[in-house]
């Protein structure tokens, strides 16, 4: 089991309250299966994995925001493409 020093993670994020929000957001991403862990899982819980990623500087609130925006844009593009294909098929 990996030892996580929360103080190191707090220093990366700025304060402990934002750390809780970022770690929870990242843990949900990993738990839902939509995202792979960026550090070796080593049989750790998703919350520990999220904290380790933050501690190593791999995840920040800004990084999560950018990734989510990219995913939304990709999803919208796919939806537009699907609608266009359906519309062209009806002609």
UniProtKB/Swiss-Prot annotation:
Keyword Transferase: yes
Gene Ontology CC annotations of this record: cytosolic DNA-directed RNA polymerase complex
Gene Ontology molecular function, alphabetical: bacterial-type RNA polymerase core enzyme binding; DNA binding; DNA-directed RNA polymerase activity
Keyword flag Transmembrane helix: no
Listed GO biological process terms: DNA-templated transcription initiation
UniProt cross-references to NCBIfam families, sorted A to Z: rpoZ (TIGR00690)
Functional note: Promotes RNA polymerase assembly. Latches the N- and C-terminal regions of the beta' subunit thereby facilitating its interaction with the beta and alpha subunits.
Subunit structure: The RNAP catalytic core consists of 2 alpha, 1 beta, 1 beta' and 1 omega subunit. When a sigma factor is associated with the core the holoenzyme is formed, which can initiate transcription.
Annotated protein name in UniProt: DNA-directed RNA polymerase subunit omega
Gene that produces this protein: rpoZ
């Amino acid at each position: 089991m990996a030892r996580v020093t929360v103080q190191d993670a707090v220093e990366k994020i700025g304060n402990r309250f934002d750390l809780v929000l970022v770690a929870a957001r990242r843990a949900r991403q990993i738990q839902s299966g939509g995202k792979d862990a960026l550090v070796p899982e080593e049989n750790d819980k998703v919350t520990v994995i999220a904290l380790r990623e933050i501690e190593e500087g791999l995840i920040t609130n800004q990084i999560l925001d950018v990734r989510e925006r990219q995913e939304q844009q990709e999803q919208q593009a796919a939806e537009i493409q699907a609608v266009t294909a359906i519309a062209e098929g009806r002609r």
